[in-house]
């Protein structure tokens, strides 16, 4: 196996979670390198963050912030989507929008609006 277009990686329990923009997946990678698709069917997932076993995902093409928990996915917010294509060499919407969790808030960087969004969890 392999990744098509990995965009973000974070620690998750003893493993890693990787967002793959091209496949539309969040993939769990264990210490031995084995991969397991955790979330599928996303539209250009870029940023990922974890809080209380929930996985928060930023979709670059839609600007949606999604929450994945126990097999269920829901939209919790929408911000400006990622950057438009600037040239044939740049993939669609690919100036990264980062996610971070601090206390009971999710922070999202938005490059088109030059903003830092804060969402209460």
Summary of predicted features, one role per range:
Residues 37-39, 76:
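Short C-terminal beta-strands that terminate individual repeats in beta-propeller domains
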Residues 78-80:
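Extracytoplasmic/periplasmic copper-protein system
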Residues 29-34, 68-72, 120-121:
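Short loop/turn segments that connect beta-strands within beta-propeller blades
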Residues 24-26, 63-66, 114-117:
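Structural signal for beta-propeller blades
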Residues 93-121:
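Blade-level signature of beta-propeller repeat domains, shared across WD40, Kelch, NHL, RCC1
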């Amino acid at each position: 196996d392999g990744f098509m277009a990995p965009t973000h990686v974070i620690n998750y329990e003893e493993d890693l979670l990787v967002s793959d923009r091209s496949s539309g997946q969040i993939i769990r990678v264990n210490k031995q390198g084995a991969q397991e698709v955790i979330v599928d069917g996303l539209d250009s997932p870029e940023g990922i963050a974890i809080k209380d076993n929930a996985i928060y995902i930023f979709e670059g093409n839609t600007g949606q912030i999604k929450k994945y928990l126990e097999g269920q996915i829901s939209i919790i917010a929408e911000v400006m989507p990622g950057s438009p294509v600037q040239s044939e060499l740049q993939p669609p919407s690919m100036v990264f929008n980062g996610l971070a969790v601090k206390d009971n808030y999710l922070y999202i960087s938005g490059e088109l609006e030059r903003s830092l969004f804060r969402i209460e969890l």
